[in-house]
A protein has these predicted regions:
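Membrane-helix interface "capping/anchor" motifs
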Residues: 172-180, 371-378
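Alpha-helical transmembrane segments and their membrane-interface exit regions
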Residues: 166-170, 191-192, 271-273, 363-369
Length: 479
């Protein structure tokens, strides 16, 4: 070994020792450098943040009492596609100049990236040796460079806000009075999160029926006894709160903007081509992929059949995982939440690539599973999935809205522009397999690694380690 190699090895050893001693400080510096580089890169790319400008135009339209759905904004003549409640929330943006608005939008989305990382780590158990603040900052520093997050900030989109609202709800403790409000508000802003309300409602209904059957069977064996348990449970309560919050957003919008509300719910909501061309490369869902494969802007019954199949399988898997104990399926609540999210993205008529910010908790879950299982297959799948989300592959093929070149793709181009739906199908397939295997597995005490939540008594090994029936009622509340 040469003197140079010795010095290099010594420096590497000292650097590693410093990182282990000061993980939070190192992660904070890493996150700051990453965000700074991201900000510089976006400014160098001269991102337009065009969707943020559309949001401001929506707020301006509301302030001036004009027709919200006749509005066109920016040189691209982009329409409003969101419920009127979103436009009411956008009115404060009208006081900002374009430069201030872009700075504000970037800063808020970077903060929301940290929030999504934090909530993802509340949903998914990490080994105890990983400090939570360091993990949050490191995840945010890396996640900001994946294509869905980059494109969200490039356009000034609200996907991170919607994801944070839903994750914030799902990670609240069981019985929290506000659990469900965030999902209801998110649905009032952007309708797709409404599938989480359906998911929680189905989980609560099945759990309640299971309890009633168990109680009646116990009474029959005992020859009487106390009355059966009530159907009500935390899942149903969250679904009811979310539904109430959503209805309130609709009612508030109807009072403030009666004409626009009536037009949205009777006309605009059914115009699935209003956000853009279905076959566009950025439309990363079943409908977009089928439109490109079939060379038609309307895949018709092919899409309806595929969406029905994926929707049913995805919802059934999510509900089953939600009602499965962690001893049978580690991180069961995370599998349930992400299965529901991927299902919503897959069956929605329009799911632009930036809607896939759920890639951050998805890749985190796969990484945790790869570390827990220690198999080459899981490691390879995690690495490949992460690289695909960071590859910007969906934009490699020719894409141009005026000429609609996506209707004339060759097989290689179809594959490139179907990368997110293919990841979604693979994820749902694995989730369904793991969940089916878990529900057939007998219960046994949970013995994974000790997570950071275990030390606080609120993780898989803490006060919420229960039997399958009781564990199913705590939804995602672990943090």
């Amino acid at each position: 070994m040469t003197a140079t190699q010795t010095i290099t090895d010594s420096r590497i050893h000292r650097a590693r020792a410093f990182v282990l001693r000061r993980p939070v400080l190192c992660a904070a510096v890493f996150c700051l450098l990453s965000f700074t580089g991201f900000w510089i890169a976006q400014r160098a790319a001269q991102v337009s943040m065009v969707d943020l400008l559309v949001y401001r135009a929506e707020g301006w339209t509301v302030r001036n009492a004009l027709d919200l759905y006749d509005m066109r904004a920016t040189r691209h003549n982009l329409p409003n596609t969101y419920p009127p409640f979103a436009a009411l929330l956008f009115t404060p943006l009208t006081v900002m100049s374009t430069g201030v608005l872009r700075t504000f939008g970037t800063a808020v989305n970077l903060v929301l990236m940290v929030a999504v990382a934090h909530l993802s780590l509340r949903l998914i158990a990490l080994p105890a040796r990983v400090p939570r603040p360091a993990a949050v900052l490191a995840l945010a520093a890396v996640g900001v460079w994946c294509e869905p997050v980059w494109t969200t900030l490039r356009y000034g989109q609200i996907n991170l806000l919607v994801t944070a609202l839903v994750l914030g709800d799902l990670t609240r403790r069981a019985g929290h009075r506000w659990a469900g409000v965030g999902t209801g508000i998110a649905t009032g802003i952007k309708l797709t999160p409404g599938l989480f309300v359906v998911f929680l409602g189905l989980a609560g209904l099945l759990l309640g029926l299971r309890r009633l059957r168990a109680a009646r069977a116990a009474r029959g064996r005992a020859g009487g006894g106390p009355p059966p348990q009530r159907l009500r449970n935390d899942h149903l309560r969250r679904a009811a709160v979310a539904t109430t919050a959503f209805v309130l957003t609709v009612a508030f919008s109807a009072l403030a903007l009666p004409h626009d509300s009536r037009r949205f719910w009777t006309e605009v909501v059914f115009a699935t081509d209003r956000p853009g061309d279905v076959e566009g490369a950025g439309n990363q869902n079943l409908k977009g992929a089928l439109a490109r494969v079939l060379h038609t802007p309307d895949p018709g019954m092919w899409w309806l059949a595929a969406a029905a199949l994926v929707g049913c399988v995805g919802l059934a898997t999510a509900v089953a995982a939600q009602l499965t104990d962690d001893s049978r399926l580690p991180n069961a609540r995370a599998w349930a939440a992400l299965t529901c999210a991927v299902t919503a993205l897959m069956v929605s008529p329009v799911s632009w690539s930036h809607h896939w910010v759920w890639a951050v908790p998805m890749v985190l879950l796969l990484a945790v599973e790869a570390v827990r299982r220690r198999t080459a297959g899981w490691t390879a799948w995690t690495v490949v999935t992460g690289l695909l989300f960071c590859s910007f592959m969906v934009w490699y093929a020719p894409h141009s809205r005026p000429t609609r070149v996506e209707l004339h793709q060759n097989p290689a181009q179809m594959l490139l522009t179907a990368v997110y739906p293919l990841i979604g199908v693979a994820f749902l397939g694995v989730a369904a397999y793991l969940t089916l295997r878990a529900v057939r597995r007998p219960w046994h005490p949970l013995r994974p690694w000790r997570s950071w939540r275990s030390r606080e008594g609120i993780g898989p090994l803490g006060r919420q380690r229960t039997t399958a029936g009781a564990g199913a009622d705590r939804t995602y509340a672990r943090g």
